[in-house]
Every structure is written in C-alpha cells, then in structure tokens.
Amino acid sequence: MLPFSAIRRNKMRDNTFSKKVFIKTVSDNLKNKYRKTIDDATQQELYQAVSEAVKDVIMDEWIATQRVMDKDDPKVVYYMSMEFLMGRALGNNLINLSAYKEVKEALNEIGVDINAIEDQEPDPALGNGGLGRLAACFMDSLATLGYPAYGCGIRYRYGMFKQQISDGFQIEVPDNWLKDGYPFELRRPEYCYEVKFGGYVQESTDENGELHFEQKDYQSVLAVPYDMPIVGYDNNVVNSLMIWDAEPKNGFSLESFDQGDYDKAVEQENLARNLVEVLYPNDNHVKGKELRLKQQYFFVSASIQRALARFKKHHSDLKDLPNKVVFQMNDTHPTVAVAELMRILVDEEHLPWDDAWDITTRCVAYTNHTIMAEALEKWPIEIFQRLLPRVYQIVDEINRRFVMQINERYPGNEDKVRKMAILYDGQVKMANMAIVAGYSVNGVAKLHTEILKNQELHDFYEMFPEKFNNKTNGITQRRFLAHANPLLADWATKKVGAGWITDLSLLSKLKAYADSPVAQQEFAEIKRANKVRLAKYIKEHNGIDVNPDSIFDVQVKRLHEYKRQLMNILHVMYLYNKIKENPSMDFYPRTFIFGAKAAAGYRNAKKTIKLINSVADVINNDASIGGKLKVVFIEDYKVSNAEIIFAAADVSEQISTASKEASGTGNMKFMLNGALTIGTMDGANVEMFDEVGADNMFIFGMSSDEVISHENRHDYNPVDVYNNDAELRKVVNQLVDGTYSPNDHELFRELYNSLLNPQQGQVADRYFILADFRSYANAQQKINDYYKNKSAWRKSALLNIAHVGKFSSDRTIQEYVDDIWHLDRITVNMAGV
C-alpha cells in the first residue's frame, strides 16, 4: 500500500483521495509514537498523529521546493519580523493542500471530529497584534503566489503572555504552547550560528596598513533555527518560516557545579534561555530594555548569517548579493540589520566600506507601521554601545557620514540634524537608520503614507522622495474565509466559483446577488449559524447567555488608548443610562463583544479592561433591562477565537483617532465576513470607504487633518465638551461615582483624569474621545435604525463582501514584488517525486 503522502500527492487533486490509506497512516503514527490505537488515544494524541500524517505530505513538497530553489537560484526575500502571529497550522495546511474536506470525512468515518482535533492545537505564541498577523498573511500569500521567501523571527517559549481575567483584571501567565511538542516545526542544528554580546573592540593594523576590528571578552549564544512550513495554496510550493531558538555555546559547567557554584554552572544556559522566553519583555526598567535589544540583534544576526551562507553556496562575489537577496524589515525591531550586514561585510568579508555600503543599501528595505513618534524605537547609546560594541561603531560611522550629507544639503540647519541624525541626544534612532540605508520605505495605507511624507518623516521625504511608497495592507482569504467561515465560503463558491480563493477580486460577482431576496436570506441564515457558534463559545468560556438575534457589535484588537476601546465602553454606559431612564425606548437588542490584550506595563490599558468587565457585571446582571444589552469580554484573544468572532460579527468597530492607525487589518477580516463597519476616516478605513461607499459604512468623527490641526494648535479643551453635554458628563462622572466600582470609587480615577486633566506632560483626552463621542453615538443610533431594515442591512453586508477584493494580501504581496523586491515565481512539479 502506498504511503498517504504518495496517495495525496498523486491522487488527491484528481479526487481519488484514499480515506483508508489516510486512516492507516494515522493509526500507524499512534502505534509508533504512543503505543495506542485510535479507539484509546486521547484527543491530543489524535491531533499529533493526524498532524504527522499531514506533515508527511508537506515534507515531500517542502523538499521539492528547496530543490527548485537550489537549482534555479532565484532571488529570495527574507522577511524579518519580531512577530509572526500564525494561528493554528493543521486546518490551514489542509485548506492549502486542498485536503480539508477529504480529511474531515475520513475522520468522521472513525468517529473523530476534526474540529475537536483542531482545538487541541495551541496557537503558536510567536506574535501579539496586527504586526504579527500581517507577517503571517504575507507568508501565506508569498507561498501561494509562488515567490521564494523565508520568514525570520524568534521561537518564543512563552509568547507575550496568556491572558486570564480574574475579578475583571487582566492577569498575565506564561503561554506554554510548546508543552506537548509542536508537530509543524523542524529543528535545524546544522544551521546554527554564534551571536555575540558585550565585551570590547580591539583594533589592529595588518602589514598592508588596513584596520581590523575584533570583539573581545564577549558573551555569546548559539542561534538554532526551527523551520516551520508555509504551504502555498494548491501549488506544491512550501516556503519556510525560520524561528530562532537560543542555546548555550558551552552549556552546563560541571566544574562550577562540583565546586558548589551552582549559579555559575547554569549561567550560560540561563543567558540563552532568557533571550527567547517572552515576546516584548517589560521595558519599564533597564534590564528589560537590554533584553529587547539583545532579542532583536539575536534573530537579525542569525538570519543574515544564514542568508549569506545560502548565497555563498551559489556565488563567490558578494557584489551579486542585491540581485539575489532582499531583507524586508517589518517595523523598527529588525532595523539593526543595517549595521549587522555592514559589520559582516566589512569585518568578516573584508570589503571596503563603500562597497559594503553599496551592497547594504541595495539589499535592505523598511516598512513603517506607525505614525506615533513614541513607537519609533530609540535606544540609549549607553545600552547599545555596551551590548553591541562593534555594531555601535558601525552605526556611529553611518551617522557621521549621513550628518555630513545633511550639512551639505542644508548648511547650518541644526534642526534638520536634530530630526534626522541616527545618533542624537544620547539615543540611537532606529527608524532613521532604516530610512537612511533602505532603498525602499513604505507605509501600509494611503493615508498613513501621506502622513509620513507630510508630517512625521517629512524631512526624510524631502531628502529621499524616491524611496517612499505605499503598500496598503491585506489579509489572506484562505484563513479568514475558507477556514474561518466554511458556510460562507461554500456559499460564495456556489455563487461565483472557487476562483476567489486565489483571486479575491472575483467576489465582486456577488454584487449581482446583493438585491436578491433569496441570496439575502441565505446569507442571513449563514450569519445566524455563525452567531450561534460564537454564542456557544461565549457560554462555555464566559458563562454568559447572549442572544444570537441581537446585533453582535465587536471590537477585537490590541488594547491601546488610540484604538479607543474606552470610547466604546463609555458609549455602552451611555446606552445603559438611556435604557434605564426610558425602558420602553426603541432599542434593538445589542451584544457588545470585546477582546484585547494590554501590555503588562500599560496601566490605562489594563484599567480599561477592568472597566469593560465591571460594566459587563452590572449590565449583564440587571434583569430590569430584559436582555436588551449584553457586554462580553473574550479572554485571551488570539487567531483561533478570532476566526469564530469575525464570522459572527454584525458590526465592526474601527474607531481609532483619525491619523493614529497606520492601516488596520481586522477591519478587512470583518468586511470579508459580511460585517458593517463603524469607523473613523483612518488607516485602511479610508480605502474601504472608497470601495463600498457611504451607504454601506457608518463614518463618524474628526478627519485626520482636523486632529492634526488641533494637535498643532493646542486648542482642544475636553472640559468644554464635558461641560456642554449633560449625557456625556453623566457617563464620565460614573467612572468615579461608584456606579461600576461600588467598593472603590477611585478605581477608575486614572481613566477619568486621562479624559479631563493633563497627565505627566500629556494633554487631557489626547485621543479626542470626548470630542468624537457625540458623533460616535449618532452613528451608533443609525446602526440601530438601519439594522431593523433586514433587506437593506443584508444588501450592505453582501456589498461589503463583494468589494473586499482589494484587501487581499495576495494583492499587497504582488505590489511588493513589482515595486520593491523584484522576485520571480518558482514552479514546483511533483510528477515523479
């Protein structure tokens, strides 16, 4: 009997998949790994056995892809990111192998529910927010489009944290996602590299009078990659995500242990372990800052070393490197790559500075993800110089030469130097270095890019206009429709064919069905089924009964003040007041659903979570309102529960302060699943509005120009708004009058103060919550009224889906390829393999 991998490879795509062979493979895996049969295996053991069977198939295609890359030697992008928020792999891999339904049926025949098996898989704790999810979507699209790529990141043992809610407060606990072993990774010790920290630099001159630099008395760790397969959709292409683990160079010291110095015996092991324990260690103290910088340098150095080793297998002249390699730096975290590539080229490859700089500046490109200056990373020079002494010297020289350029272009203009220098005021400004060295600098939505060019990075744009470009973010429809919402995916395929899976623009054909009562009813039934699924999840995890016939109004995203979860919950408080004052008011039942993690050291964000849960406790337990209003906070928001949430949402909350959100991608996932957006004209909302129009979104609030104008003029006074709006004033006062904190009236004082009183150098209501509140409440009232018109609402939902085509990450990646990376597709033929 042929192994499952061969059966699938040769037969599955022509619909002769053998369920019998697949089950035999699973059975053999259980026997060999656990000494068990299918009947007595645990759910976790079944997950592992099924995953190993699927991995067998992937391995053949992975090897074949690598052979093609070795043979054809195409240009490769190394996508460097601190985060990769991948989501569960089993279901997604089966979707991309075109095998999900067949495997589901095979498992059903032996009494195994594929959904229960999928629920055994942990979400790999390799990311946290939109930055990491974007990177994951990009990897999926690169493989599906057939472009050779490596993702480069860190194999965090515990992720950022697993969120638990206790008495309404966020509690951070380790996310031990590796405890049962992860089947979709492959340790590659043959590609380990040394990464050095600390010590000092010794200069010497050789007989030819050339300077040499050597790092001495350093500590080092070994970077060991674990490769994860990234499966392209139905094309045999499997790219690699290489996530780096840190291992000690010398390991356990038996000599120190025997001498009783137990701490010293494990010193090297602890140094290595600490590097990869958590994502974004708290940097409110020096040790946290040091650890973050070491993490960034660690994975960047290892990734560049592996990239150069791979390049040198095929080429001897490093001047060819820009023709074969591009390093895309996803945000500022990996931007130390500029100096590290220079260090390797100058110190280890012995290239002259000018040659090394020419190569580097044609190999590195930078994606900016933020408009907020405080999020553009800066390191104290003292820390940077102490931890990375030779790299700092490289940065110093890059800066010296660039400041000369500034002075030549703008003689005597110290303000330009202050804004643009890489080293200034005791800090290393990483974004500045990325812009100086990168041949491309891109924003992630049209509005974001324009603000960068005209505001935050205007001086750089004036000096290097040719570098700046826009690449509006996107999402992969394969995970967020095909896998997350199979009912809607099957319905769309019946209506317009399956081509949308690789060409999302084909969903535009659904416009023809937007006015059809039959299509509207079919869509409504699918939406309700998904709402029932989410209601069941909420009951199981929160113990709250929610009405699937209520409006599901959802805000799920990283908790940050500019995203204005506080405004959302203040509006819920406002609605509750209205219902209490007038129980017979015209109000369509509404369930407000939140999901968000707050950074461990972010006080106001954590207090906002507590407020949401306190409001939920009051409202959900008030029988007098007859269930008209419910509030739910979904614990530990992540990709796997996000898929359930997106499919069920009626209303998508995209309410950031205009000009603050670079793009957003949650907005696109909701749109793809037929939710209507309430939002500001910010980030990608602007482009969504251009696609679907004012009739199919609920836009409110100030424009980005208005916000920026107020910020520049310093003329906004939230107290005026507070004094002139009695209903809003009542809501704000409820933060401190005990309505939602009867045992501690001061519990939410910091949130109250943030709205009305200047705080530690920050203006009051920095994110214009009170300024936009009334406009927001009016837009919410429009939702209440519009939802009652079932036909109109369903038409708008269908038109949102029909206009989502632009927002596929396939489109985004093709633009990166055309304008920045200049890659060629590879073709992987499995015939005869």
Where are the model-predicted features located?
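A conserved ligand/cofactor-binding region detector
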Residues: I7-V833
